[in-house]
Amino acid sequence: MRLPWIRFAKQKDELNEELQAHLRMAMADRMERGESEDVARRNARREMGNIPLIEDVTREMWGGVWLERVLQDVRYALRQLRRAPGFAVTAMVTLSLGLAAAVAMYTVVDQVLLRPLPYRDAGSLVQITEMGKDGMPGWGNAFLDIAEWQARSHRLQGIAYYDVEGGPGHLNYLEGKDTSIGVSNATVSANLFATLGVQAAMGRTFLEGGNGAVRPEDAHTILLSDAIWRNAFAADPQILGRMVKVDGEAYTVIGVMPRGVAFPLTLAHPLVWVPMIPSSADKVRTRHETPHYETIARLASGASVAAAAHEMQEIQWDVAAQYTDQDNRDHISSIRVTRYEDTLVDDSVRKSLLALGGAAAVLWLIACVNVTSLLLARATARQREIAVRGALGASRGRIVQQLLIEGLMLSSAASLVGIVLATLTLRAFEHGLETQFGIHTVLAPNLRVLCVLLLLTVISALASSVWPALAVARAPIEPALRQGTAQSGTGRTQHRLRAALVVAEIAMSLTLLVACGLLLRTIYTMRHVPLGFRTDHVMVASMTIPSYRYANRDLYKDLYAPLLERVQHLPGVESASLMTDVPLGKDFRIVFSFGDGDGKTATDTRRSKIRAQARAVTPEIQKVFQFHMLKGRFFNDTDTATSLPVVVVNREFIREWEGEGSDPGKFLGTPLFGFRDKKQAVVVGVLDDDRQDGIAEPSQAEIEVCMPQITPGSTFYGPTSIAMSIAVRTERDPATVIPELRDVMRKASPELANSNFTTMEQVVEDSYGSQQLASRLLEIFGGTALVLCIAGIYGLLAYLVTQRTRELGIRIALGAQRVRLMAMVLRQAGGMLMAGLATGLLLAYATSRIVGTLLYGVKPHDPWTMAAVTLILLMGGLAAACIPARRAAGVDPMAALRSE
């Protein structure tokens, strides 16, 4: 890299030596004709002309002089910045904050929304979902339905299916010779990886026997993800053919997938894949007994999503007709075909991230405007210096180049600080994405992010430097040289430019602060929503156990009940309860039918079936959460496996069932519960509504099932279906009980020590979801924008007062009142504030709908929020203006005149 520069330097030396040789020859010739040495040298120089100019012209002909001049400008810019460290640090920190926000948000958007999927032609992959008449998606697609699609669809190819055992949050246990690790186990059709267009990095994938079925020889084989191969087996190259166990069942490793390849992408744990073997249950069409699978396919050549959806809907009408039960037909009556990449991120999350990205871009613009104002002031102060350079022959282009390079040096330094700040921000962002958006990803700057950072660095340098450079370079030279000082060489144009920049800062800051205010009001509203239960002094533990170790056993009798008994006797524990779902968690929704107690469907109710949230609990849950009973009773110790099955519903359930005012006492049931002798349960109590899916979500119909009454064969609280949690109300800080609770759970089953422990207050905090994360980020963005805005107002007014020191001194000497001088400065500030606030209100009104999807209980154009933000900015701006105003009023006329 240094060779061209060394060659250029050598050419310069050779040119200088040649010119000096010509000069010596001319001198020698004149001295031979009788001239003295001094006269000969003077005449020879006059004859040759301007030697430095000859060197410059010759070097320009070589074409490398531009690099020399750039390096000169870089060295000069560094010297100038060292002479003004306060200015350099202020500009660098300001710009680094804007760059950090922009880079951090782009990294998040890139990883979550823009990253290319690790599959061939991922844009043609589609997800197929059976839908009910109510517009709700079903539990998945039945094997026979998928087989029908495979046989009849022409616009979809490679229809494949899969299922993640126990759901996305469930852990399976992979055991090798010397390892045991929790994994997500996906059961997949043999053609899945062919549909995805992915080959194994080592070994092979499953062999297909037709219609996605696996060949018999691959019935007990397994594929490992790259992460599992490296972490659990130390990247052993001899892994192929080795025997491993998943939940106690033996499999032979036949392949390792490439690094970065995962499917489904929404899982938090490393993956293994085993082939799906159709069972007898797959050969029937019933919603409750038939296994259901997620389905993915690839669009045929030339087919569109709309065309595929139309074709699949026609097929689905025939499929639905093959279900004998009307309820089953109603729940699969239509079909939805969606691009797979669009299913990975919820639409509300997508809009939230894009809104936050826009807010970060606005903050970056504010930082650029602030630095532009600083550079304009600095360039104006250096106007006489620049005029001298112009008078000595520097072209306008060279002056602009020098100022641009100075801006680029500042921007480059700011980018280095910005990438560090962005990396620190991303570490905190990962937790928020997981807990409040439900997205599991590792956030780190990649090559695309670094390219964007480089682009933003250059744009920042140009955006903040071009305007000041052109404004100063175009200024006439003679007036600047004639003035005695730099202070008196400024013009009205530069003042107007800086005032316009401050107005833009105020407008953009108000827009950000309005969005921040709307979200803060949203969080305030959500914090005051009645939850329907108490959260203080309550902690919960979500239990994770190896499912295969409790197969064919009474899980409640052998594990849960003894564990609950020991927990209830811990010091400081008031009460404890088991539950399949924690309030504000992901509740399980099923359909209940109403009966007359003899297994027959009732006909005297307003509706014969109802879709409701279902949760199995022990009687002590009422003491833990203190739900409000409206009618009847809650479960007690008399509700056992041999007594009449009982359930408790909420107010919304009654409202949907028979309307307000109905009394409990009706029978209802569902095949899922597995009550003894298939008895239907009777409703014995009505609870007040509570929040289930989230604070911002309305209450749904809910039913509580008495856990001791569920038979051992039921899948309701089985280890491979719905997770089990234990809730504990304590007399002291719940966090202090965790070590003792963990020890009790370890004694019950060693794997329970790895359960997730948290307090209900933290569960509530996490349930604020995207609003919480967005409000925190906008608090940072808005606060930074407010500081930069106030700093911009102060900087401009302080600069104007400094520039007008002589004028102010003369005014005071001529009798001007100091109060009027203060008012003059405050009037200037007020004019900028009014213009900026008016523009900002228009922008805020136009853009506030962008955050509308994040709001709860607040309108996007909330007048109180806009008024409060306007008042805050107005008061902050006037406070910033008071300091320069007092300085203007305190000018000593004698000192001001003497300084000139």
Residue ranges and their predicted role:
Residues 1-93, 298-300, 325, 478-492, ...:
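Negatively charged linear elements and acidic catalytic determinants
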Residues 44-87, 119-120, 167, 179, ...:
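Membrane-helix entry/capping segments
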Residues 97-124, 425-434, 508-537, 566, ...:
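Alpha-helical transmembrane segments
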Residues 165, 172, 184-210, 218-352, ...:
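Mid-to-C-terminal secondary-structure elements
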Residues 367-411, 791-833, 837, 850, ...:
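Interfacial "coupling" helices/loops that link adjacent transmembrane helices in transporter permeases
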